[in-house]
Amino acid sequence: MKPTYCGYAAIIGRPNVGKSTLLNQLLGQKISITSRKPQTTRYQILGVKTFKDIQVIYVDTPGLHAGTERTINRYMNRTARGALRDVDAIVFVIEPHWESQDAWVLDNLKEIETPVFLVINKVDKIKNRAELLPLIEKVSSLYAFQKIIPLSAKTGDQVGTLEQAVHQLMPESPFYFPPEQVTDRSDQFMASEIIREKLMRLLGQEIPYSLAVTLIEFRKEEKIIRISAVIWVEKKSQKGIVIGKGGERLKRVGTNARLDMEKWFGKKVFLQLWVKVKSGWADNERLLRELGFEE
């Protein structure tokens, strides 16, 4: 019987470097929400890619970041660090410049023996690739990376190079997931994340970090899925901002989310949204656990 190869690859980096976009590109479909705002990803998400006799389970993590005053930030850092345990490869994503936050992430890797690929993302924004040479020289002196790969997660340029490099590190093993499965997350989780993505894309800089989404109904019928969700905010003033004048903003969120859900589930979706205030939820460990954050 022909052997199969299967293993885990963690995607890490500071917030907003394009980790989730890279995961979606690797999988050939969207399973991790994206926005231009940092810290869009809050939960660890597995993306499964099976190609012939190789299965790679990519682990998309929240962005590692210094400054952990809020309880929710400490939870996200623990989640990201926890993803580094027992993986077969690490994909460390940066932008085409080196920042102090990148150095802080690298410090978290220096005691880990797992091979690390350095991905320089967003190279589609650079006119001349020769501009990357000083950066490549600098990072090469900081750590013995398995390979340094400039790519564009947005366009897909050189993503195949990364994929082939990761394949070479996968150990011989039976597949952990059926070949057709693309994520470990439930339909309910995907629905709540789609709603949160639309909120983050429509709202200002601060409010998205005070938002959470929980489902109170998820019912599959023959021709339609009925979903009811609560959007939690921390302050009464934020509730008005989320709803918008005459309910216009909440209506846009609902429409955009419903259209994405219908693509994901392959059937019609009836979606209802409510906005409620839960003061201090992002600093309350009990409430964070209720919302799906893990120790």
Curated annotation (Swiss-Prot):
GTP binds at residues 13-20, 60-64, 121-124. GO terms for cellular component: cytosol; plasma membrane. Residues 151-153 are annotated as: G5. It is found in: Cytoplasm; Cell inner membrane. It is a peripheral membrane protein. Residues 5-172 form the Era-type G domain. GO terms for molecular function: GTP binding; GTPase activity; ribosomal small subunit binding; small ribosomal subunit rRNA binding. Residues 121-124 are annotated as: G4. CDD domains: Era, KH-II_Era. Pfam families: KH_2, MMR_HSR1. GO terms for biological process: ribosomal small subunit assembly. Residues 60-63 are annotated as: G3. Residues 203-279 form the KH type-2 domain. Disulfide bonds: none annotated. Monomer. This is GTPase Era. It comes from Coxiella burnetii (strain Dugway 5J108-111). The gene is era.
